[in-house]
Amino acid sequence: MSELTSLTIAEAREKLRAKEITAIELTEAYISAIDAANERLNAYVKVTPDLARVMARKSDERIAAGTAGELEGIPLGIKDLFATVGVHTQACSHILDGFEPRYESTVTQNLWDDGAVMLGKLNMDEFAMGSSNETSYYGPVINPWRAEGSNQQLVPGGSSGGSAAAVAAHLCAGATATDTGGSIRQPAAFTGTVGIKPTYGRCSRWGTVAFASSLDQAGPIARDVRDAAILLKSMASVDAKDTTSVDLPVPDYEAVLGQSLKGMKIGIPNEYRVDGMPEEIETLWRQGIAWLKDAGADIVDISLPHTKYALPAYYIVAPAEASSNLARYDGVRYGLRVDGKDIVDMYEKTRAAGFGKEVKRRIMIGTYVLSAGYYDAYYIRAQKVRTLIKRDFELAFDAGVDAILTPATPSSAFGVADENLAADPVKMYLNDIFTVTVNMAGLPGIAVPAGLDQKGLPLGLQLIGKAFDEETLFKTAYVIEQAAGKFTPAKWW
């Protein structure tokens, strides 16, 4: 069975098409793997084995009939932020207890239309607010990686921690995820997987629980660059139900893998050399530069002068949008309801009981910066900074840069229930220091594993591209992957 779960999506696709394996065999292998491991890793909050078997059998029928889709028979995990008809969708929050949508998100519908099989819903930070997957109502996800000679439990990153852990532990062939400030790229870096946040508007947001609507974007987490390319092609589409989705053709991302980087310009931003950055992150960055140089790319220094303002601006804009989006959860129509003496009391008690501490903190921050006395001082200024950040990237790309290379995270994975981070939320927010600029500018960014630190934990590099030029990111990330090799955790679970 483990031989089947070790197949990449590309490998499984070939074996399914050649009828060397069946979709039901592949699906059963993943169901067994989840049964054996989920109690320890807590990657899934809802497993759907019966539904998976039904979908797999239908895939086998289509393969036999010669009408197989692009992802026919491939078992996937779905982040608990995507609406799935009749299946638990709670954004890992108590306030959405028992919610089973009557509609399907556009992203998941695209995957099912291409023949993919749903294994279940994946754990995440509550409402996607977090960088460690510790804010989930269902408890933390445990990273499949451990430091050499240590049994300490590590976080997988967040908010898409369940997606990253499940992919790294081979509990699904690939997974959907979302990224508002780094929630695909940071967990990918922490788990030795590949994660891409596409350009804002590349994937529909319809049917995805909203955190910050101008920043949220769906994307895949996968075992390697090729699998990420295959998944994004299926996930992406224009959608009449989402006016922010863009009507552009979705390229065949897989087709660019292996193309030459000769003559490409890779920008290295000075501002990403932050105080206190570990030497091994700097070394990895230099190694990435050397790999791209060896592949024929030209390396140029660039300046993104407003980078230092990105994190504070992000933590004004994102909570402000969250404060508005989360106002709809009141206990009236769906989810948790705590009775009160009147409707206002019921609202207050429901929201007090239903939201976790981090979500409440961000709602309070958002409500504060939107209040009459502070709107101009905070929110409007943050939006102006956002425009300047976007302009920095535009100037770099206008000067001929094709992609930008940076570290993905300021460190490797840290321990579950880290007291330093628990005591100071700002330290936790600093995990997003290399990733939030990409969301603020609406650009695509990919995290690709590039090495291990001195403790034997994975580290990633990030590539940032021009709007709707994910092809260049895949092509360049593939070169890094070929040079670095792939990384798999030693099995303990």
UniProtKB/Swiss-Prot annotation:
Coiled-coil stretches: none
Alphabetized UniProt keyword annotations: ATP-binding, Ligase, Nucleotide-binding, Protein biosynthesis
Quaternary structure and partners? Heterotrimer of A, B and C subunits.
| Reaction it catalyzes | L-glutamyl-tRNA(Gln) + L-glutamine + ATP + H2O = L-glutaminyl-tRNA(Gln) + L-glutamate + ADP + phosphate + H(+)
InterPro entries this protein is in?
A: Amidase (IPR000120), Amidase_CS (IPR020556), Amidase_dom (IPR023631), AS_sf (IPR036928), GatA (IPR004412)
EC number, UniProt record:
6.3.5.7
Q: Which residues cross the membrane?
A: none
Pfam families given in the database record: Amidase
Query: Which organism is this entry from?
Result: Rhizobium etli (strain ATCC 51251 / DSM 11541 / JCM 21823 / NBRC 15573 / CFN 42)
Ion transport found in the keyword field = no
Protein function = Allows the formation of correctly charged Gln-tRNA(Gln) through the transamidation of misacylated Glu-tRNA(Gln) in organisms which lack glutaminyl-tRNA synthetase. The reaction takes place in the presence of glutamine and ATP through an activated gamma-phospho-Glu-tRNA(Gln).
The family assignment reads: Belongs to the amidase family. GatA subfamily.
* Name by which UniProt lists this protein: Glutamyl-tRNA(Gln) amidotransferase subunit A
Catalytic residues in the record: K79 (charge relay system), S159 (charge relay system), S183 (acyl-ester intermediate)
Q: Does the keyword Cell membrane apply?
A: no
Q: Which PROSITE patterns match?
A: AMIDASES (PS00571)
GO molecular-function terms, A-Z: ATP binding; glutaminyl-tRNA synthase (glutamine-hydrolyzing) activity
